[in-house]
A protein has these predicted regions:
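N-terminal Rossmann-like NAD(P)+-binding domain of SDR-like oxidoreductases, especially those catalyzing
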Residues: 1-174
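Short hydrophobic alpha-helical segments enriched in small aliphatic residues
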Residues: 350-352
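Short-chain dehydrogenase/reductase
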Residues: 90, 138-146, 180-192, 222-223
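C-terminal substrate-binding subdomain of Rossmann-fold SDR/epimerase-dehydratase oxidoreductases
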Residues: 191-340, 367, 375
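Long, low-complexity, intrinsically disordered segments
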Residues: 355, 361-378
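Oxidoreductase cofactor-interface core, primarily capturing Rossmann-like NAD(P)-dependent enzymes
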Residues: 161, 176-177, 206-207
């Protein structure tokens, strides 16, 4: 059995690839490199450049690699951009998820783990918010993800497919070992933007809205370390592989921080001050949202990196590597993104593996042979 990870060259998908490798399981990665980065995929991981909306490509990967589970990360994720260009978000996040699901059903994939978002809740009337709260997304991004959730639930009811929907809160940090971090061109994540400003890659940063009904007037968010989130995906998949029922799960720590609190924490970790400018509210931003993740913890998931300064420290270490060019990825420049290539790698790793005689929780794959071959997708 093998896992297919869409968007595996991106921030969260890439860290999930590392989590699988850390436990001895080698996934297959599919990414179109529109925002992902080829260098984020470790050597030895089979990697295909292509579109999740290409049903025939996905079906070939499923059949050729005996895929039993798909972890679907590939998506557009910027809320203001979704307001400005909603049809592009419905195409990439909803229509292409439909196509991917069709290929999964045709290929008899048993398990589907979906990357969703707390944006489906909109501006909840109370926090921490649980999975039973009525969804009321404020943006096309949130609605595109909620539509995909509905499709997945209906597909599971009709076909032999079980799912886990993971609703992320605000993802932050970087691999503690320094192997990977956030490298997306034009990323809008608060901690990344603040660190880029601290490192003088930006001349200033903006705080969008200071009149929200929160203690200091800025938005409050629940920040979850990307490595803890990656392990949440493994816990969800193990639950499904062990015969567990389909689930919808919040992914957060249950503690909120305001934008000002996060910026002040970045200043302390980076030991530098930087310019902050006030800007109007952005469309689609709720005032405050914090997770109740009790259901995820029932699957055995336990946060290991639940500490805001530590998240910032890990992200800071990564940003310094990017600045120094020591990450192997480098800083993408406007108009010259290193992630913009769309060609198929001329040579790729082919890994033959076998599952050991253990349960799904202790599955270990062994690499018998690594051959360099050219594999054409078209």
């Amino acid at each position: 059995m093998t896992v297919l990870i869409t968007g595996g060259a991106g921030f969260i998908g890439g860290h999930t690839v590392l989590a699988f490798l850390d436990r001895g399981e080698i996934p297959i990665v599919l990414d179109d490199l529109s925002t992902g980065n080829r260098a984020a995929v470790p050597s030895g991981v089979p990697f295909f450049v292509g579109d999740v909306g290409d049903a025939e490509l996905v079906l070939r990967l499923v059949q050729n690699h005996r895929i039993d589970a798909i972890l679907h990360f590939a998506a557009k994720i910027v809320v203001p951009e979704s307001v400005a260009d909603p049809l592009n978000y419905y195409l990439n996040n909803t229509v292409k998820t439909h196509t991917l699901l069709q290929a999964a059903v045709r290929g008899n994939v048993k398990h589907f783990v979906f990357s969703s978002t707390a944006a489906v809740y909109g501006n909840p009337s109370f926090t921490p918010v649980s999975e039973t709260a009525d969804p009321a997304p404020l943006s096309p991004y949130g609605r595109s993800k909620l539509m995909s959730e509905h499709m997945l639930v209906d597909a599971s009811a009709a076909y032999n497919l079980r799912y886990a929907i993971l609703r992320y809160f605000n993802v932050a940090g970087a691999d503690p070992a320094g192997r990977l971090g956030q490298s997306t061109l034009g990323a809008t994540h608060l901690i990344k933007v603040a660190l880029e400003t601290a490192l003088r890659r930006r001349s200033y940063m903006s705080i969008y809205g200071s009149d929200y009904p929160t203690p200091d007037g800025t938005c409050v968010r629940d920040y979850v370390h990307v490595s803890d989130l990656a392990r949440a995906h493994l816990a969800a998949l193990d639950h499904l592989r062990d015969g567990g029922a389909s689930r919808t799960l919040n992914c957060g720590y249950g503690r909120g921080y305001s934008v000002r609190e996060v910026v002040d924490a970045v200043r302390r970790v980076a030991r530098v001050d930087f310019e902050i400018r006030q800007a109007p509210r952005r469309a689609g931003d709720p005032a405050s949202i914090v997770a109740n993740s009790d259901q995820l913890m029932k699957l055995g998931w336990k946060p290991e990196l639940n500490d805001l300064p530590k998240m910032i420290e890990h992200a800071h270490n990564w940003e310094k590597k990017l600045t120094a060019g020591a990450s192997g990825i480098g800083i993408p420049q406007q108009g010259h993104s290193v992630s913009g290539q769309r060609t198929m790698p001329s040579r790729r790793h082919v890994c033959t593996s076998k599952a050991g005689p253990a349960t799904a929780r202790t599955r270990v794959l062994r690499i018998h042979q690594v051959n360099r071959t050219k594999e054409k997708l078209d």
